[in-house]
Amino acid sequence: PLARKKMRSPLTSAESFQPQPAVARSDYHHILMVLQGMGIMLERAWNSFVNMHEEDLRHIFLAALNTHFVEQASGETFNSEGKTDILIKHENGGIVFVAECKVWTGPMSLCDAIDQVLSYLTWRESKAAIILFNRDRQIATVLNAVPKTVAEHPQWKRTEQSLLDLPSTFLYTIKHPSDENIEVSVSILVFNLPFRK
């Protein structure tokens, strides 16, 4: 037999309201610096990584992030509408950053990556990144295509000055798909990791 449940009044907290965690611009910059440093290391030793796929490369970036954010970065973690490649949680459990790793196959692959990363954000999350790997094209072609492709995306709001000092990094303000008044910072970091020829 099923037991009847008694409705209980919710317990009220004696503590004051704690707002949702948000990433300070300096922390977002730190996350991007870790990703950039790891990506540059991969480029310098590209021959060691030529046969790795997105998922394998993601694990390398996760390892680097977890040296800075102990047990806060995870991979293939469910948030909102799916599993994001990289997710960083605040110590209180709130999500503060998500990222997707993608191989560039043309402008459409970047548009799809933007849609994908946005689908993993609730209205509370405002910092994201796309780690874009160039595997078989001239890097200048990819770098020239990124700004044009993003500016044509329907959620694009404006182009910002990148927080990083490399011509292979970009920062955009994107409209959140659930509310165009909510702004999301999306950084795109491009790394050249060719396949062995």
What do these predicted ranges mean?
Residues P1-N66, V70:
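The feature marks a conserved, polyanion-engaging helical scaffold used by nucleic-acid processing enzymes
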Residues H30, M52, D56, I60, ...:
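Short, well-structured alpha-helical interface segments that form or flank functional binding sites
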Residues F61, I86-I88, V96-V103, Y120:
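Conserved catalytic cores of phosphodiester-cleaving nucleases, focusing on short active-site segments
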Residues L62, T67-G93, P107-S109, K175-E180:
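Active-site metal-binding core of divalent-cation-utilizing nuclease and nuclease-like domains
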Residues H90-N92, K102-T105, V190-N192:
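Short, flexible loop/turn elements at secondary-structure junctions
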Residues F97-A99, A129-I131, S187-L189:
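Hydrophobic/aromatic beta-strand patches that form the interior of the parallel beta-sheet core
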Residues V103-P154:
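Catalytic cores of nucleic-acid endonucleases
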Residues R135-K197:
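Domain-level recognition of nuclease-like catalytic cores that cleave nucleotide substrates
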